[in-house]
């Protein structure tokens, strides 16, 4: 006898089996055979195991790109010359005289502010000073004045010689510059006073409302305190809380952000404690 074999042994049967069964039973068996066919497609189908799962490929994995960080802009300290006497970044100290030493600043204008003495500055510095003085008055109701601004070579020689007579050469070298070595000769430096006068050209000016405001805010207008307290071993001069230097808002902002204290340090120049000769 031939046996019909399905994938599952439990579903196998032999031919002729139905002929020996009574009709009613055959009907039941026929119905059962229909179920067998279903089983053949399901439970009685040949064992094939689970369907294989396709292996994932690297190309199916989303690629996450790491953004390239934007480099922090570097302040260009070579944008303007520190040697050219006409540059607003010129650095003048005991090792860096003006060239020529009798240099006369261009585009000088009379300062349209309160003046203790007739004062002039270069146009750009003058404009910035007016804005700064007006901002101070608007904020505090108080006033500032120009004590001394541009000085010619001859005027600086006269002032220095006068100080030598009063203070001796060592004292004069701490208190004033020799002719050809003064920032005042650039038309970019200013001695500032309170108005009415209070601690004029004295270190106590640092404690006045004007002196305190300037120390905190002058950088916003392009000005810096040139000879700060405790830096004589770099600048060569005693503390002068009244002496401010214009370098422009671009440089003064960077100067402030870096926490710089002297132009020598800011521009990585050597200390200028004394004259070379």
Segments (PLM) and residue ranges:
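Bacterial N-terminal signal peptides that target proteins for export
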Residues: 10-11, 15-31
């Amino acid at each position: 006898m031939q046996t019909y074999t399905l994938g599952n042994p439990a579903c196998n049967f032999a031919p002729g089996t139905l002929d020996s069964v009574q009709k009613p039973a055959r009907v039941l068996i026929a119905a059962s055979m229909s179920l067998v066919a279903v089983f053949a497609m399901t439970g009685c189908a040949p064992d094939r195991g689970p369907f294989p799962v396709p292996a994932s490929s690297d190309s199916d994995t989303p690629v996450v790109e790491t953004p390239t960080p934007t480099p922090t802009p570097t302040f260009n300290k070579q944008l303007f010359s520190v040697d050219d006497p006409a540059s607003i970044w010129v650095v003048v100290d005991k090792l860096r005289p003006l060239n020529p030493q009798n240099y006369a600043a261009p585009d000088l204008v009379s300062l349209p502010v309160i003046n203790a003495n007739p004062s002039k500055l270069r146009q750009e510095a003058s404009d910035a000073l007016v804005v700064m003085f007006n901002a101070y008055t608007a904020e505090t109701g108080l006033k500032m004045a120009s004590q001394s601004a541009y000085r010619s070579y001859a005027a600086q020689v006269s002032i220095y010689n006068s100080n030598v007579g009063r203070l001796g050469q060592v004292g004069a070298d701490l208190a004033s510059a020799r002719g050809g070595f003064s920032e005042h000769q650039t038309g970019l430096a200013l001695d500032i006073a309170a108005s009415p006068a209070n601690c004029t050209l004295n270190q106590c000016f640092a404690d006045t409302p004007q002196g305190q405001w300037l120390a905190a805010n002058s950088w916003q207008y392009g000005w810096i305190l040139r000879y700060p307290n405790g830096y004589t071993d770099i600048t060569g001069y005693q503390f002068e809380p009244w002496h401010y230097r214009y370098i422009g808002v671009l440089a003064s902002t960077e100067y402030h952000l870096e926490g710089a204290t002297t132009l020598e340090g800011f521009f990585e120049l050597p200390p200028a404690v004394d004259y070379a000769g």
